[in-house]
Amino acid sequence: MEKEMSRNTWTMRDVFRLSHPKGVNPAIAEFILRGEVLEEAPDIIHGYDAMTKVTSVNGVLSVLEGYPNLPWETIPTHLLNDPEVWKALFHNGQLRGQNAIRNVGRLNKINAFDDMVFAREFANVIADEDNIKASRLHPINYLNAITANRQPGYYEVMETALPGIVHDALNDGFHASFKYVKPANKRTLLGLDVSASMTWGNAIGLSATPAEAGAAMAMTIARTEPYYAVMGFSRRFVDLGISPGMTLDSVMRKTNSMSFGGTDCSLPMEWALKNKVEVDTFVVITDSETWAGRKHPYQALVKYRQQMGIPARLAVIGMTSTGFTIADPSDRGTMDFCGFDTNAPRVLTDFSAGRI
């Protein structure tokens, strides 16, 4: 509540008006509906109210000392440019998990990492495996932070403009996070677009290129799913030879070296049917070209299901696309992704597992 009192013209008061919640703490309701802070209101409301009145960094630090559970979103924007504010938030435990990863660039920009002790403490947190596990951080979260802070002029995926200790911690966290990805435990076939256009621009929702995000997802599937194949849309639909032990840069070099063909989203099903390969979930990752063949992918999926006797699912991810239609809206076994943000991998896994 205290993080998002309003967003996109909607307020918490609108939520109350439309949802008619029951059993709400009267002091919370009074605050949301009328802006009144009653004496019996929870501490976090008193803290939020106090933070709205501060006019200086010292005022922020004083409120954070009295109300350590306040998140950074409660602090006036113009006072978030001081490193001491972020250090206080960090030491209050408010910069953990995704909050820490998302704010790496901001902390670097305001020179917070010039404090060597803070840089070490922060690096320890973002690379800590207990924190990764508890926060359910995905490799894509780390990849996004790394590519968002990429060193200008560098082409290697893992080079950044960050201090070495933070850069190394992001790398360590990226590789450590794979072991905590919850698998779908399905036989998964990934078809990956290897065309040059995958290296142009960023995926919608990420700071990474479609090629980088696709390579990270290939690594995720290879390292977490017990049964998988990673194929490329080259001149033929070919096995890319992606193994669990490969690094992101090595996967990128592998895909960049392939000659490419059109991204025909029906090919994975046609190839699997022709070769009698049993697949539970087909995943296609491309930039925006989602249908370059004569047969609609959904028709190929239906044929595969009928002839193999497997209720296979199909997810098509257009990382730079703002709209396409592959999935049948009436078929729960198909899903289209337009763009690919840091929440998308979990949605994909839940879809593959049949949880959604």
Can you annotate each of these PLM segments?
Residues 1-211, 223-356:
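Long lumenal/extracellular ectodomains of secretory and single-pass membrane proteins
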